[in-house]
């Protein structure tokens, strides 16, 4: 059958008159087979009654008033009950083809006349043509205003008498069922049964798209909504505030509350300066995570009066070595106040005081001094004249027994010059060797065991009376890290055991400089392992460079070659957690040099090493320790520097009383070095007597550039809290932005150190010292009236709290106090006296 003849409802008749006889049965069967679709009548389509008596010779069209088009209507008996409605509610067969012409019997049209239904049974029908007609009729009916018919009622039952359905109609309605996609339940609740009954319904084309989309979604599944899981491994960050109404801190952890109670800061002081306390506690909060290297400084603040089992010939800690780059900051606090061997007199005897990081810690002097807690050596009297020369001989060091019994009571932070280097740690069997230490034996001037036990630096046969006082010292600085320390305990203990054997194996298998030097003590390895297992430091890990990147940068700045073939006669004079300090002689010139060996794997901040090397290379000045060379030898970094055999300024201020002329000379040389650094945009940030080295001739040079910071026009301020607490400027303590003037404040504190023998607040806990620096501002001098007015004015300008009003290095170099400067040769006797006093101290303690 030709499909084009059924593309619309208007067909051309081959003749104007048809015979009554219908097509033969065979013809109908043949055409029925051509219809490839079995159609079924829609279940809800109305059944129209027919009059069996109306028959005629022709197929004449019967116009129906119940439909909009006579071409799509079914003849019915209007007299009987019927669901046929006006305006063609069904909508399936609506159209605009209003014609009365008769049609061919085989045209496939589905309108019927009064002819008997028996004659049309099995009449063929083309579904594709019907679908095209439906789409056209639907589009036309959408453009015509249609009056909404009344709703069909369930009581309306059509009269089905005399009507037999054709198989074509049944197949057609099944096809339309799939296209319209309606259910009986939908039509029972919705009066708009078909697409042409309402303006809001979708055409058949859209229904096809909807059906296809539903099919695809059913096959592929609808996209799932985004699900956000709960946070994993959350970390609680402590937030500390201050309630102005109640005058109390809010959000303080128990450890901090106990720390404040034991630090000697009264509630009255806390209420008087709440913002200062918040700043200090935030400082603790930040650095408890190990973000700043200042904690290393705290760790070694008082290393000299805590014992660690070492051989009597073990040299002092590299942490007290002025040549120790990062090793000085992360050094082992195993050394006493002064080095063991005389050749190490250049060594930095007093390591910077850091706050513990997961190591056994105890803060010293947490409460006011108990009766008898007076330094053995009274502070030196300020000089009366500029040309005054030291007249007091070095004090005799106490014996081991007297030190063990009286020293803990007199001063938890011993005064310099009175502590024999072979005191309890070296002269008597120490206790802590057999005791388990949390996360490493980090015993230092500000440290003890984190569990709050009595500090193990007292002789086993003698126990100090103020044990409770000592316990307070131990707990003060450890509380912020107890949780972290407990987590690191197991791993750090195993690593300590492994690394304790490494120095012995290295000595047995490799001819390294350690063989030339005295035997290393196992405690140094323990200190190294403790440093190798630092506490959790999330922020620092984010900022640390990759290990390979660090090594590549070091390769770029280091000299290629084997340093063991360039230097000979290495003598170990110091030991730190990162390595040892040696003196050696150059093969070519025969000059004596200082070599700092650092194990890169043990460095907490490798960037500081690179920073220090770069600063020293670019800072050639007569008042800065001369950097000679650097080498990468295996896993160690060798830094070769000028050897200052006179030692540090700390030795001089400990064993001698300095005149104003000598103090002025030291200040002048230090200011010259600072001016050079500041002109290059470098801030030293750790000026103190420990980092001022002297030669035997009295020449003065700066050292330890690991904490240097670069500033420029775009970044001319810093806010990182680094340095040693007792020498820190107020703007650093309160975490404000700072610049070059922080070095000037530290110089003023160092001047007080040369007057009194120690910096202000040294007998206070580090936390209270920070509080006093922030609240008191300019410190007071014990006997200020004995100073000349010019010297007092010099100190006043250097110790201005407001950095804008504080003098610069250039200003102080022009100050009248500089005219008091004594020749540098006048410092040579002080250096020699300090060396002699140290040698006598060793002899009395059995040192060799």
From Swiss-Prot:
Residues 65-102, 152-171, 328-338, 441-451 have a biased composition (Polar residues). The active site is at residue 686. The keyword Nucleotide-binding applies. ATP binds at residues 573-581, 596. Residues 1-208, 306-547 are annotated as: Disordered. GO terms for cellular component: cytoplasm; incipient cellular bud site; mating projection tip; nucleus. It holds the Pfam family Pkinase. Coiled coil: none annotated. Keywords: ATP-binding, Cytoplasm, Kinase, Nucleotide-binding, Nucleus, Pheromone response, Serine/threonine-protein kinase, Transferase. Residues 183-196 have a biased composition (Basic and acidic residues). This is Serine/threonine-protein kinase ste20.
């Amino acid at each position: 059958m030709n499909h084009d003849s059924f593309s619309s409802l208007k067909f051309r008749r081959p003749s104007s008159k048809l015979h009554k006889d219908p097509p033969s049965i065979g013809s109908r069967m043949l055409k029925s087979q051509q219809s490839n679709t079995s159609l079924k009548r829609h279940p809800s389509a109305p059944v129209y009654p027919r009059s069996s008596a109306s028959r005629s010779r022709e197929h004449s069209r019967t116009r129906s008033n119940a439909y909009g088009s006579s071409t799509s209507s079914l003849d019915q008996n209007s007299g009987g009950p019927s669901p046929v409605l006006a305006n063609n509610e069904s909508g399936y067969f609506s159209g605009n083809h209003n014609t009365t012409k008769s049609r061919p019997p085989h045209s496939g049209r589905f309108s019927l006349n009064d002819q008997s239904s028996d004659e049309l049974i099995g009449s063929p029908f083309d579904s594709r043509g019907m679908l095209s007609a439906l789409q056209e009729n639907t589009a036309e009916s959408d453009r015509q205003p249609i009056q909404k018919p009344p709703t069909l009622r369930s009581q309306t039952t059509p009269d089905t008498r005399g009507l037999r359905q054709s198989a074509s109609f049944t197949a057609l309605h099944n096809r339309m069922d799939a296209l319209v996609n309606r259910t009986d339940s939908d039509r029972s609740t919705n009066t708009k049964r078909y697409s042409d009954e309402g303006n809001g319904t979708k055409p058949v084309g859209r229904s096809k798209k909807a059906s296809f989309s539903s099919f695809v979604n059913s096959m592929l599944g609808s996209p799932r909504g985004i699900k956000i899981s709960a946070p994993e491994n959350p970390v609680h960050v402590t937030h500390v505030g201050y309630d102005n109404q109640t005058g109390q801190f809010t959000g303080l952890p128990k450890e901090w509350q106990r720390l404040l109670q034991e630090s000697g800061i009264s509630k009255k002081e806390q209420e008087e300066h709440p913002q200062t306390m918040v700043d200090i506690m935030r400082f603790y909060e930040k650095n408890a995570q190990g973000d700043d290297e200042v904690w290393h400084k705290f760790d070694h603040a008082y290393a000299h009066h805590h014992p660690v089992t070492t051989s009597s010939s073990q040299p002092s800690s590299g942490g007290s070595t002025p040549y120790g780059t990062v090793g000085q900051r992360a050094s082992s606090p195993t050394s006493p106040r002064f080095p063991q061997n005389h050749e190490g007199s250049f060594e930095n005897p007093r390591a910077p005081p850091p706050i513990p990081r997961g190591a056994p810690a105890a803060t010293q002097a947490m409460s006011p001094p108990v009766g008898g807690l007076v330094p053995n050596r009274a502070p030196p009297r300020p000089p009366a004249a500029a040309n005054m020369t030291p007249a007091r001989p070095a004090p005799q060091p106490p014996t081991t027994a007297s030190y063990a019994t009286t020293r803990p009571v007199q001063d938890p932070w011993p005064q310099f010059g009175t502590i024999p280097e072979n005191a309890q740690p070296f002269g008597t069997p120490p206790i802590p060797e057999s005791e388990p230490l949390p996360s490493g034996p980090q015993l230092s001037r500000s440290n003890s065991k984190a569990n709050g036990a009595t500090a193990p630096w007292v002789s086993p046969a003698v126990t100090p009376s103020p044990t409770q006082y000592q316990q307070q010292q131990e707990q003060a600085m450890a509380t912020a890290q107890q949780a972290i320390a407990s987590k690191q305990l197991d791993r750090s203990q195993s690593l300590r055991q492994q690394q304790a054997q490494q120095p012995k194996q290295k000595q047995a298998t490799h001819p390294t400089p350690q063989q030339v030097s005295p035997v290393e003590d196992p405690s140094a390895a323990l200190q190294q392992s403790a440093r190798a297992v630092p506490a959790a430091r999330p922020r620092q890990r984010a900022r640390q460079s990759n290990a390979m990147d660090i090594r590549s940068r070091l390769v770029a700045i280091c000299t290629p070659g084997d340093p063991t073939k360039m230097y000979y006669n290495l003598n170990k004079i110091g030991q730190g957690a990162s390595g040892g300090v040696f003196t050696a002689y150059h093969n070519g010139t025969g000059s004596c040099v200082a070599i700092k060996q650092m194990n890169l794997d043990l460095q907490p901040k490798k960037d500081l090493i690179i920073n220090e090397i770069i600063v020293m290379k670019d800072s050639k000045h007569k008042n800065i320790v001369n950097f000679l060379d650097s080498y990468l030898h295996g896993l160690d970094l060798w830094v070769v520097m000028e050897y200052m055999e006179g030692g540090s300024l700390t030795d001089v201020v400990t064993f001698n009383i300095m005149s104003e002329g000598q103090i002025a000379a030291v200040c002048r040389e230090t200011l010259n070095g600072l001016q050079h650094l500041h002109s290059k945009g470098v801030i030293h940030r750790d000026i103190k007597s420990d980092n001022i080295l002297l030669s035997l001739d009295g020449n003065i040079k700066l050292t330890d550039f690991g904490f240097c910071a670069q500033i420029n026009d775009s970044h001319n301020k810093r806010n990182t809290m680094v340095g040693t607490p007792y020498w820190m400027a107020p703007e650093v303590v309160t975490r404000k932005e700072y610049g070059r003037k922080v070095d000037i404040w530290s110089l003023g504190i160092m001047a007080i150190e040369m007057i009194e023998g120690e910096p202000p607040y040294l007998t206070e806990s580090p936390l209270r010292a920070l509080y006093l620096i922030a609240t008191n501002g300019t410190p007071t001098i014990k006997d200020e009236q004995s100073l000349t007015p010019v010297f007092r004015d010099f100190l006043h300008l250097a110790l201005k709290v407001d950095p804008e009003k504080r003098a610069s290095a250039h200003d102080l170099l022009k100050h009248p106090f500089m005219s008091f400067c004594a020749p540098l040769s006048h410092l040579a006797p002080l250096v020699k006296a300090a060396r002699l006093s140290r040698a006598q101290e060793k002899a009395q303690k059995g040192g060799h």
